[in-house]
């Protein structure tokens, strides 16, 4: 039977039979590797790039009628630096879902990408440690520019250095109530630092704040 987390991600990332996924990132990273496995599981097709090249990426979208992709913000920036005539030379209308994460995306960059590709861009925030996940559709982002979304998996808290809750709009460390246990290989000290004193919460050290609607905005990543 499908695992609960798999079922959750399948719905959130709109994984579906017949999807054609383009992966421009190395498979030794957890996110693209997971995307590859999920796509195979639902009966989709995956096109894997040996390395990211912005114009080649666009040409592959047109050639294979790519419906889905998983990217990082630097890839957006590199594509936007292409001459306008090059960007417009390729048909990207087949795109339905483009998921990005791994690093903060500058507001101007994401705004330009949504203007170019339409509201197909989805953003997530999480870590390999799998404590929790936030998610944001293009439509949500346009009304909350700069957000990485609301919590969809886990329970999040923004705490100050004294482990006290931060007020709305005040930046602090992003903590998640433990959804899973993890430890760093041969690094007991770092593992201990990642947990709260009572070990009910964990963090990777990222900083951020939430607005009144619970949307998370990152201010610094570890």
Where do the PLM segments sit?
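Conserved AMP-binding/adenylation subdomain of ANL enzymes
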Residues: 1-24, 28-67, 82
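Gly/Ser/Thr-rich phosphate-binding loop
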Residues: 41-42, 63-71, 80-144, 152-157, ...
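A structural signal for the hydrophobic beta-strands that form the central parallel beta-sheet
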Residues: 23, 48, 71, 100, ...
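Short coil-to-beta-strand transition motifs
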Residues: 148-153, 202
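Alpha-helix capping/helix-boundary segments
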Residues: 53, 75-76, 105
């Amino acid at each position: 039977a499908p695992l609960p987390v798999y079922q959750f991600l399948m719905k959130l990332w709109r994984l579906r039979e017949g999807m054609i996924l383009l992966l421009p990132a190395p498979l030794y990273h957890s996110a693209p590797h997971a995307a590859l496995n999920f796509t195979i599981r639902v009966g989709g097709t995956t096109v894997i790039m040996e390395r990211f090249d912005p114009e080649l990426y666009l040409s592959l979208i047109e050639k294979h009628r790519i419906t889905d992709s998983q990217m990082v913000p630097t890839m957006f920036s590199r594509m936007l630096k292409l001459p306008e005539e090059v960007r417009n030379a390729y048909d990207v209308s087949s795109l339905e879902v483009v998921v990005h994460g791994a690093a903060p995306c500058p507001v101007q960059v994401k705004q330009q990408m949504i203007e170019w590709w339409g509201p197909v861009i989805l953003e997530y925030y999480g870590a390999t440690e799998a404590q929790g996940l936030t998610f944001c559709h293009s439509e949500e982002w346009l009304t909350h520019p700069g957000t990485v979304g609301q919590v969809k998996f886990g329970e999040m808290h923004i705490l100050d250095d004294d482990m006290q809750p931060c007020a709305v709009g005040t930046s602090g460390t992003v903590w998640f109530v433990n959804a899973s246990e993890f430890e760093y290989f041969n690094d007991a000290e770092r593992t201990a630092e990642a947990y709260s004193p009572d070990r009910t919460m964990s963090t990777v050290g990222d900083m951020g704040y939430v607005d009144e609607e619970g949307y998370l905005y990152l201010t610094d990543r570890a």
